[in-house]
Every structure is written in structure tokens, then in C-alpha cells.
Amino acid sequence: MSGVNNTSANELSTTMSNSNSAVGAPSVKTEHGDSKNSLNLDANEPPIDLPQKPLSAYTTVAILCLMIAFGGFIFGWDTGTISGFVNLSDFIRRFGQKNDKGTYYLSKVRMGLIVSIFNIGCAIGGIVLSKVGDIYGRRIGLITVTAIYVVGILIQITSINKWYQYFIGRIISGLGVGGIAVLSPMLISEVAPKHIRGTLVQLYQLMGTMGIFLGYCTNYGTKNYHNATQWRVGLGLCFAWATFMVSGMMFVPESPRYLIEVGKDEEAKRSLSKSNKVSVDDPALLVEYDTIKAGIELEKLAGNASWSELLSTKTKVFQRVLMGVMIQSLQQLTGDNYFFYYGTTIFKSVGLKDSFQTSIIIGVVNFFSSFIAVYTIERFGRRTCLLWGAASMLCCFAVFASVGVTKLWPQGSSHQDITSQGAGNCMIVFTMFFIFSFATTWAGGCYVIVSETFPLRVKSRGMAIATAANWMWGFLISFFTPFITGAINFYYGYVFLGCLVFAYFYVFFFVPETKGLTLEEVNTMWLEGVPAWKSASWVPPERRTADYDADAIDHDNRPIYKRFFSS
């Protein structure tokens, strides 16, 4: 989509939605060349493309994206520390209640609110604060939301014995993390070379798992103290993480798409040059620049974006919003936060004396599995990873729930004190299998897909809505889990199993493959209405050669079982 013509934006969208629109596409005059077909070059001459280089050539951009992805560490750190805070004696004494025996405890309501209200803050922050990135740029946006996060941490760490002060602090820090969760993957997706975009966006999840792991380790290291050191060390380190995040923003390039949108074309070229390790005058870079600029100019024809545009079905934006909301919701409904938020509590119930150690093991498996995900997301594609991930996780939950129900809860709530080391060990093993499956597929894959899906004019809004759905389900799961497990205990696992079955079929029918495509090509694929299960075979119009069969994606002769277990 490297140009615009004199038709309206809606007319052009309709033209492009025809799957055979490669012929007769609009022509344009680009900034660096003569008039040419915007959707298809000469059938016998492949377009100039930025070359795929050895991974070693992308070291610089990988480091820069790692700095941006550090926002994931901040979120992971909160997840890892809060799961232990609610089991630390000083935290319970300060923010809990006394029972008739004079013992302090955290009620299910208070525990649920303290843990889960953070997600509400994140949902609001993602929707409201992501707009800062559209107005002032992604980098300034990330600095701003990180500053808001620091304010929330300051309120929490100064709490003495008022649980509602700590509660308010978590809401405010959640506002900041919600903004980070939208802007960080967004900026990475916009500066990363298309050949490794999925890998670099996956770094956000990798940093998140590192934060969870180190948060677990910090709780384990401070649990033997008998004062506020138990939990204030974990909170105090948040200031260091925020400082690192802000400092990193001084070195990373601004989004070339944002720069073009605000008329800073030369800066945009320098950003592309820095990301792709080529000269500013490289012909392939200039073609990439023209493609991005033309796509932005096309979007500008429709005027300023509004929230109501998210409901547009003609431009397939509503379909993308729905897909983003569903995929982010289903990520929570895999049941991952059942273990991450309440892992320490869960493994107490299976008879472990030091359940903090098991949480550290979860953190280790989660962290190192994420390194595998950095490779698999680009090697096998987004859809294949999600399909195999859902299938493997539902198998893990089937074993986890069945062992828990039959060995540790055979008589229901009337026998809650049953423990079994064998059953407990089995459940821990399959928990680790689950964490491995989640970390290598759904954990980062959802953020990759959502960051690649929306056209630039509504990208921040679309990503904010999709991410807000993730936070809202995170709130519901983290708040109601203590009540649900109190009523049905390990039967809860069957609920997540059912959600994973649904997730598998949803991905197969509604989530397209975006591996190897530029963001503009992803937009074209959506406009052409390519069925998700055929998207892996789709070729962008400008890359189609004379022997390309436009009807090929309409026919799939593979056996049904092969269709369901591949992209």
C-alpha cells in the first residue's frame, strides 16, 4: 500500500477488500520515484525490499528494543512481589484484620482487592494515558506513564497501617503500568525490522518473566525479616526500575510512523536507518519510507480518528478490535494468573512447608521458557504457537485438576485438610509444564498479534481497548479466585480447561497469521478479508509474481487434522 489516489478513503478500502484487487490498483507518485502501481509492481520484477540480515546485524536494534521492553519487567515485578506480600507476616499485621484469637489475617475480600485493583488501574491507564503517545510521541508517552507509576509506588511504600492507602497506591501505579503495556509493545512493533518484529515484541514478555522471577526471589530473601523490610525492599526497588526505564528512553529511536504522521520526515528516515542498519539513502529504505508515508497519507484522507471509528466494519477495524479483545481475554482465561498471583497459596494447600520455593521454581521455568518463545514466535508463526499452546495447556489442566480433585479434595469441602506428597509433586510437575507451554506461546504471542493488527490512525485506541480487556479479566480472576477456590477448590481447573478448548477453536477460525509482513501489509490482508485459517498462504499484492494463484487460499486440500494443528 504505497500510495493514495483521488478516490475517497472508503472507496479505496472497498477496492482493496477485494481479494483479487492486485490488478488495476491505484497509482501514485511517491516522494522518491515516478508514478507506479501502489499495490502491485511489474509481475516479473519483485519490489525492492529491505534485506533480511544475519541476527548479529540486528544487535543494536535488539538492545534498543530491550530497553523499551523493560516496561514488561515493571509489570512482572509487581506480579511477582504482590503474590508473596499477601503471605508475609508484617504485611498481614499492618493491612489485615484480627480474628477472635487475636491473630492477624487478610480476609478474602481485602486480599482480593489489594491484589486485583491494580488491574483496574491498568485498564483505565491503558485507555486514557495511551493517548499521550499519539500527541507527544511514544518515548515521551512512556516517560510520562512511568512517572505516574512512581507516584503510586510512593503512596504504597509510605503506607503504615491503612490498607486503603496501599489500595489507592496500587490503583495509581496501575494507571502507569497500563500505559506502559500499550505503548511499549506499540513502539517496539513500529521500530523493529519486519523480519524480526515478532521476536523483538516478544522481548516485552521476556522482561515480564524476568520481573516475576526476581520478584519471587526478593520475597524469598526478605521473608525471614520481622518488620516492614519484608515488603518495603520489593517496593523500594521499583524506583530503580523506573529510573532505568526513563534513562533508556533517552537512547531509543522514536517511532518512524509517528514521526511521519507529525511531519518529521527526515527524523523518520534516520529512525528507519537506525533500526534496519542501512544508510539513510538506501533505495530499499526509501521504498519502505514511501510505503509507510503513503499509508499514513491514505489514513489522513479520512480525517482525524475518533473512538467511534473502532466500530467501523467497512474498514475491518471493528473486526480487529473484537479479535484483539478476545485474544487478550483468552490469554487471561488460560489460567496463568491462577498460578502467578496465588502460587504461594496454592502450594500451601498441597502440603508444602515452604511454598515460596515453589514460586521461585515457577519463576525460573517461566523466565527461561520465554527465551524459547523469542525464537518460536518468528520461526513457527503466531497462529501455530497459539494453537499448540492452547492444546498443551488444556492437557496440563486436565491432569492438575483431576489429581487435585481425586487425591486432595475427594469428599469436597468436608475434608479440606487432606495432603498427599505424591499428588502434590504431580501437580507441581504439571504446573511447570503448563507454565512452559504458556510462556512459549500465549504469554507474548498475544501482545505480538495485537501490536501488529491495527492501522496507525486507531492503533493506540485499538491496543488500549484490547489490553484493557486483559486487565479486566485479570481483575476478575485475581479478585474472585479466593472465593471460587474456597467453594470448588481444584474443580476450578476444569473451568480454565473449558476456556482453553474455546481458545483453540477461536484462534483457528479468527486469528490471522502476520509473520513476515510489514504493518502496512497486515492492514491490506485485513482489508482483503482473508480467512484466518488461510492467511499463512496469503502474499501481499506488491510481492505477487506472474505465477501467483490468487484463488489458492480459497482451497485447502489438507486433511482436517493438519489444518487444525498448523498455521
UniProtKB/Swiss-Prot annotation:
Subcellular location, record wording: Membrane
Record SUPFAM superfamilies: MFS general substrate transporter (SSF103473)
Region Disordered, annotated ranges: 1-45
GO biological process, any: hexose transmembrane transport
Its membrane topology: Multi-pass membrane protein
Chief place of localization: membrane
Presence of keyword NAD: no
Cytoplasmic side: 1-56, 134-139, 192-197, 254-336, 378-384, 451-467, 511-567
Regions of compositional bias (Polar residues) in chain numbering: 1-22
A GO term, aspect molecular function: fructose transmembrane transporter activity
Any GO CC annotation of this UniProt entry: plasma membrane
Alphabetical keyword list: Glycoprotein, Membrane, Repeat, Sugar transport, Transmembrane, Transmembrane helix, Transport
Segments crossing the lipid bilayer: 57-77, 113-133, 140-160, 171-191, 198-218, 233-253, 337-353, 360-377, 385-405, 430-450, 468-488, 490-510
Extracellular topology ranges: 78-112, 161-170, 219-232, 354-359, 406-429, 489
Residues with glycosylation annotation: 87, 227
Protein family membership: Belongs to the major facilitator superfamily. Sugar transporter (TC 2.A.1.1) family.
Job description of the protein: Probable glucose transporter.
Protein name per UniProt: Hexose transporter HXT11
Species this chain originates from: Saccharomyces cerevisiae (strain ATCC 204508 / S288c)
High-level lineage: Eukaryota, Fungi, Dikarya, Ascomycota, Saccharomycotina
